[in-house]
């Protein structure tokens, strides 16, 4: 999810956004984006923090494993609806270019840390509740149009990074270091 990508780095790029039907000559097949779908995907990415979007690929290749991975231009190399959509998208993005580099404003954050993520990967009981809890919180936020962040909690996390969130949810934090405990206590004592 783009929310998870944003937790790693707040300003990211989409390297290979789909622009046509796709597939290899050995496996994989998927339909072409419907009219307007490339714009929808691009704007969704921008709304979630992307500062860069690159469409894969410019021109459909005529040989190789990705022969069926269609690009903006088809085999005939002529202008088409996909090129028109990308051109229109470019003009739309120019109107909002000042948003590039803007901070995503989340209403709440879901705290995560590697100790508990790794524990949930190997502990059959922890895994069941960890994954479903986070998934349901994410789905509820999406359905209610409530912007949220995943927030990586480590022993290097500072209070300043947490205080911007009015609400933090730390589902099933079974492993907690002394440093993180003090940090969360400070967050609560300061009104979080």
Feature map (PLM): residue ranges:
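Carbohydrate-binding surfaces of carbohydrate-active enzymes
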Residues: 1-192
